[in-house]
A protein has these predicted regions:
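Conserved segment of the thioredoxin-like fold in thiol-based oxidoreductases
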Residues: 86-128, 133, 137-140
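Conserved redox-active cysteine motifs that mediate thiol-disulfide chemistry
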Residues: 66-83
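Oxidative protein folding and maturation machinery
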Residues: 1-48, 52-53, 59
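A generic structural motif
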Residues: 53-54, 159
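Short pre-active-site segment immediately N-terminal to redox-active cysteine/selenocysteine motifs
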Residues: 57-62, 66-70, 139
Length: 172
């Protein structure tokens, strides 16, 4: 906070403006706001938008699992997400995965190995940049939970938090 005020007092307007811009971007992804749109591609190469996918799942609680083939924690979490996915009626809850892989073949191989039963997408190069810029994350796994109205509920830090938040939302 001191650095923030120092920028103002010392007249470092360029740094202050960059800081303010980052705050505005981060605010877009806060609880209660719609999901920030990202450019994606399906396994068959079709380009699509995250906002359209979220809209298609309105009426359900949606878990968006951002992951990568090279992320050990992501891959180890998949069985726990499968268990959660299998335990809740599809009319109430859905999961989609969005890969942050830049290597298409690694993404495809990981999908085959992990046998995730839900729909898969991969960030395009533009989507990749937008993901890290707007969601202000430094890595994956990154979970985003969306309510049936298409608004962000939160971004739980792990599968245990995902499960607790999903159950709480379904009780609502």
């Amino acid at each position: 906070m001191f650095r923030f005020f120092s920028m103002l007092v010392l007249g470092d307007t360029a740094r202050f403006n960059r800081f303010a811009e980052r705050l505005q971007l981060a605010e877009q992804t806060t609880v209660g706001n719609p999901v920030v749109d990202l450019d994606l591609v399906t396994p068959d190469g079709t380009r699509c938008q995250l906002a359209d996918i979220v809209k298609a799942h309105e009426g359900k609680t949606l878990l968006i699992d951002f992951w990568a083939s090279w992320c050990g924690i992501c891959r180890m979490s998949t069985p726990d997400i499968k268990t959660l996915y299998d335990s809740i009626d599809r009319s109430q809850f859905e999961v989609i995965s969005v890969s942050c892989d830049e290597d298409d073949s690694a993404w495809r191989e990981a999908m085959k190995e992990d046998k995730m039963p839900w729909t898969q997408y991969c960030l395009t190069p533009e989507g990749y940049k937008a993901f890290f810029l707007h969601y202000q994350t430094i890595g994956v796994p990154y979970y985003l939970l969306v309510n049936p109205e298409g608004k962000v509920i939160g971004n739980p830090g792990g599968v245990e938090q995902v499960e607790a938040m999903v159950k709480k939302e379904l009780e609502r």
